[in-house]
């Protein structure tokens, strides 16, 4: 009788066949709802930032006239002239689309616990992947902007921003916006990892050494 009483107290009044006793997800649900809301807002923010960086780069164009004696040479600077900047634009477009789709999927999901394990793992890996990809692409664009601004004497590359100042300024603005997007995506990667951890964590009360203990 004494053991039954102790077992009953340990399980909040449950006395019955030893085994697994389900407990409420109320506490976890509240936290998951907050993370779900934060995830939606941050994904929409990341999408907006990536689109802003993309549009800023795509609309960046400047023409300069070089006069040599009686000859005038016209040169136009735009993102399509540099492979790194083209990859920058394409990558931001893909990540913006991914962020929008993930936000919409999260909105239509009925609850955090109804989300499949496979989707949580997929989201976790994709969120990590796009952060690394965007860091690499933005780093390459930053290097291009730096060389255009400072030149590279070792390979006799002259400065270009003296002639295309507005173009360089707009490239810099696009890169800065993209770095803010990276910070947002890093936060999302941490958030998706936490959501996966909570979903995978046992949320049942199990018997151990004759007593019922919670795994939460």
From Swiss-Prot:
<dbReference type="Pfam" id="PF04535">
    <property type="entry name" value="CASP_dom"/>
</dbReference>
<keyword id="KW-1133">Transmembrane helix</keyword>
<dbReference type="InterPro" id="IPR006702">
    <property type="entry name" value="CASP_dom"/>
</dbReference>
<comment type="similarity">
    <text>Belongs to the Casparian strip membrane proteins (CASP) family.</text>
</comment>
<keyword id="KW-1003">Cell membrane</keyword>
<feature type="topological domain" description="Extracellular">
    <location>
        <begin position="149"/>
        <end position="170"/>
    </location>
</feature>
<feature type="topological domain" description="Cytoplasmic">
    <location>
        <begin position="192"/>
        <end position="216"/>
    </location>
</feature>
<keyword id="KW-0812">Transmembrane</keyword>
<feature type="topological domain" description="Extracellular">
    <location>
        <begin position="59"/>
        <end position="86"/>
    </location>
</feature>
<comment type="subunit">
    <text>Homodimer and heterodimers.</text>
</comment>
<feature type="topological domain" description="Cytoplasmic">
    <location>
        <begin position="1"/>
        <end position="37"/>
    </location>
</feature>
<feature type="transmembrane region" description="Helical">
    <location>
        <begin position="87"/>
        <end position="107"/>
    </location>
</feature>
<feature type="transmembrane region" description="Helical">
    <location>
        <begin position="129"/>
        <end position="148"/>
    </location>
</feature>
<feature type="transmembrane region" description="Helical">
    <location>
        <begin position="38"/>
        <end position="58"/>
    </location>
</feature>
<feature type="region of interest" description="Disordered">
    <location>
        <begin position="1"/>
        <end position="30"/>
    </location>
</feature>
<protein>
    <recommendedName>
        <fullName>CASP-like protein 2U1</fullName>
    </recommendedName>
</protein>
<dbReference type="GO" id="GO:0005886">
    <property type="term" value="C:plasma membrane"/>
</dbReference>
<dbReference type="InterPro" id="IPR006459">
    <property type="entry name" value="CASP/CASPL"/>
</dbReference>
<feature type="topological domain" description="Cytoplasmic">
    <location>
        <begin position="108"/>
        <end position="128"/>
    </location>
</feature>
<feature type="transmembrane region" description="Helical">
    <location>
        <begin position="171"/>
        <end position="191"/>
    </location>
</feature>
<keyword id="KW-0472">Membrane</keyword>
């Amino acid at each position: 009788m004494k053991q039954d009483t102790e077992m009953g107290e340990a399980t909040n009044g449950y006395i019955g066949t030893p085994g697994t006793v389900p407990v409420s997800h109320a506490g976890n649900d509240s936290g998951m709802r907050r993370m779900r809301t934060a995830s939606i807002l941050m994904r929409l923010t990341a999408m907006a930032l990536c689109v802003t960086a993309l549009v800023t780069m795509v609309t960046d164009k400047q023409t300069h006239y070089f006069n040599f004696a009686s000859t005038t040479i016209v040169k136009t600077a735009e993102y399509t002239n540099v492979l790194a900047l083209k990859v920058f634009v394409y990558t931001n477009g893909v990540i913006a689309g991914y962020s929008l789709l993930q936000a919409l999927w999260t909105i239509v999901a009925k609850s955090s616990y109804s989300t499949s394990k496979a989707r949580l793992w997929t989201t976790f890996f994709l969120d990590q992947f796009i952060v690394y990809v965007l860091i690499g692409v933005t780093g390459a664009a930053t290097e291009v902007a730096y060389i255009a601004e400072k030149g590279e004497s070792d390979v006799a590359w002259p400065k270009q921003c003296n002639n295309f100042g507005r173009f360089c300024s707009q490239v810099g603005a696009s890169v800065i916006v993209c770095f803010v997007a990276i910070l947002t995506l890093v936060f999302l990667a941490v958030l998706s990892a936490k959501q996966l951890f909570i979903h995978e964590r046992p949320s049942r009360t199990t018997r151990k050494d004759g007593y019922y203990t919670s795994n939460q």
